[in-house]
């Protein structure tokens, strides 16, 4: 049993500190993951709270070693449901946020600029590639955990990670980021 499962069991046995610890640990990363679907951090924060509210009220049984995958799968399902119900909005502010695409070489060297470019390229990627790369690299999930979250097989995750990395490499090269600058 991992630390997450023991904290969840602690909560199930009546100690709210277990759930508080899980919310501290996963609140921000889960919000970022949900924001990848909704592209609205405020809605993502609300949905993250809904995920934990679901755990709080339903108290589902979660198999050993599967808490993180269960949490992200629940977040994914809620985000997709929420996104399908949401009305499309057009915002003039969003147009002002568009990157100009022309970056000077000296700006690229700075970490903040490279991170901005990385996020820009990730946003342009196929959503399946983006999700699997996010889960495996940013959330440090195994391929098996990512497969459980997305409902795919481990082989499909392996292929998607490979294709996603190739796609990201091409997008980064287009923006002037190469392996030599990493």
Q: What positions do the PLM features span?
A:
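N-terminal module of bacterial RNA polymerase sigma factors
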Residues: 1-29, 36, 123, 170, ...
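Short, small-hydrophobic-rich alpha-helical interface motif
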Residues: 11, 30, 34, 44-55, ...
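Sigma70-family region 2
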Residues: 12-13, 39, 49-66, 85-87
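C-terminal flanking helix
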Residues: 27, 31, 52, 126, ...
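Arg/Lys-rich amphipathic alpha helix in sigma70-family domain 2
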Residues: 73-92, 111
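DNA-recognition helix of helix-turn-helix
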Residues: 80, 144-174
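Acidic, proline/glycine-rich intrinsically disordered inter-domain spacer in sigma factors
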Residues: 95-123
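A short pre-motif secondary-structure segment
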Residues: 132-136
